[in-house]
Amino acid sequence: MGTVSDYFSCLVFDDRVMKANLSADVYQSLRKTIDQGAKLDASVANAVAAAMKDWAVGHGATHYTHWFQPLTGITAEKHDSFISPAPDGGIIMDFSGKELIKGEPDASSFPSGGLRATFEARGYTAWDPTSYAFIKGKTLCIPTAFCSYGGEALDKKTPLLRSMEALNRQAMRILKLFGNEDVKCVRTSVGPEQEYFLIPKELYEQRKDLIYTGRTLFGAKPPKGQEMDDHYFGVIKPRVAAYMADLNEELWKLGILAKTEHNEVAPAQHELAPIYSTTNIATDHNQLTMEIMQKVAAKHGLVCLLHEKPFAGVNGSGKHNNWSIATDTGVNLLSPGETPYENAQFLLFLCAVIKAVDDYQDLLRISVATAGNDHRLGANEAPPAVVSIFLGDELQGILDAIENDTPYEAARKKTMKLGVDVLPRFARDTTDRNRTSPFAFTGNKFEFRMVGSSNSIACANIMLNAAVAESLKIYADRLEGAENFEAKLHEMIQKTIKDHKRIIFNGNGYDDAWLEEAARRGLSNYPTTPDCIPHIMDGKNVQMLTAHKVLSEAEMRSRCEILLENYCKTVIIEANTMIDIARKQILPAVQGYTAELAGGVAAKKAISTDIVCGYESGLIARLSVLTDQIAAKTDELEASVLELKGAADVAQEAYAIRDAVIGRMAALRAVADEAETVTAEKYWPFPTYGELLFGVR
């Protein structure tokens, strides 16, 4: 295979391949489309399509697909071959510019949330030239957006690209005011840290709950979990190391910058982190990464679990969304600068983020809301459901000094005025790493830690980009008309700090006292998905997202509907799986063991009625009680699921699930898990937590 540099990005139609396979004129025209959004001429599209097809066929591809990200949360693709009939009865390999730019998949079976009727099947895919095409297996995959016949976004890429453009538009206004004439565009970059579990495939196949839902619905706590803290950063087991090596190779071939890998806190839990890339590309790459992780695992006799909470009692999995803003000239706008103006510029962008997170904390919470993530958030392993920002003591001290017009200690008692004084330099390390914060500043970026491990990162970045764009718009509107730029700038930053300091919290987010303090500050707290999703339609949210043309009101309403539907369907599948497992596996197992014990007692009594059999009799009594409880709790859960059919709408159904079904699922699990602890191992019908968590050797 050669060195990594020999095969890195070998399956990607990237800039190097374009230069080598396109004429200079076609290449320059395509670059203009990629860099500036210029319209692509039909002749150029045909030339690009022909070169792309020749390159792909040369790598063994026989088909192409418009690869898109519908609102299911996973990717979608329909494969068409390159073959066309030739006059002599043979075939030619053909691919036109029209086929490259636009596709027409059937949209009827994808979630639309009422944006179209089922009979209105036509949907369109449109090529995203900013994200390179790639080869997967024998198929050329062309990243695309996906919309309805009427033009409404039916995917996650379209609003993400819109949000990036909205932020670029407003950030450019600010940068012009600071005299940055050489900057042509501003982009957000993301590096998502992907957590996951690896378990033996042969054990996975014996667990209906893992197969149907991606998480264990039953399972008693094993003698050992993560108490010893010996797995985090521990020596990677040979089988896992082999998996990681193959995974890296597959990712590198696709140009995915896989960088860091290590064991995570829970047994069998691991993490993969890439180098940062532009947000839409990072989103595409993360979707690919999750798919490839699961495929490579199968080759190693493993299963990769991406659910946020596959096992109770140990940490779940998240996906830290490391987000930054930079210019095309290479300036990170979240890094303090060397000159007074650079520091004022940094503080303005910092304040824009602070204001955005405070004003739209509900949208950030909504962006990570799923049934799976509800198990993780606020569970002393992940940030709470309350959104707050961590800045660190030194940056906090600087903001306090600006707010109060008081000297900052580290600045030698010198009162700072923005645009006049240089912000004191501080090492990135002084910002610490508060793992309990949902949204932490870590030196030159923000780390949004609420995203779930199976989630697309698109949603979180759509809301974050749009909210920051709104803050920057407000700032630009005020500064562009200011008579005294420096005075207005200082006043505006000072006002932002005063008005939005409630969102800043540098303490322990796991502490219950913080939830009480957050309530006093007036911060929103939405513990579950049904609590937060309806707030997407709050007036301020509709106004902001529509004003920046990120989502229309109809698109927002559809997403509200789809998110609630997904929540309901997910939990109902879990509940029905529990009912099935309880009746067909757990109850027969407990009854079988009880019968064996009863037979043993009868055999002993047949020898002598004086034999006490106290242990067996006590255990039989306990198992009999548990059997009745499991049966009763199963019936109660089934009844609560059946009651959902009477719900007036999806919101009412979601509330009923939150208020009744979830609790009855927990009650059934509690008695079933207790039964596991007193049932002989040979009778228990599926692998235990101990086997699953410590099965990869």
Regions found by a protein language model. Give the residues of each.
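Gly-rich Lys/Arg/Thr-decorated short loops/hinges at beta-loop-alpha junctions or inter-strand turns
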Residues: M1-D14, T33-D35, P223-Y232
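Short linear, low-complexity motifs centered on an aromatic residue
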Residues: G73-G89, S108, R207, G214-T216, ...
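Glycine-rich, acidic/polar active-site loops that bind/position phosphate-bearing ligands
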Residues: E120-L306, N315-G318, I325-L563
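Active-site-proximal loop/turn and secondary-structure-junction residues that shape catalytic pockets
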Residues: V44-V48, F68-P70, K98-E99, F146, ...
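Hydrophobic/aromatic-rich, well-ordered segments within soluble, folded domains that form packed cores
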Residues: A61, T65-Q69, H285-K299, I325, ...
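Active-site core of metal-dependent hydrolases
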Residues: Y7-E120
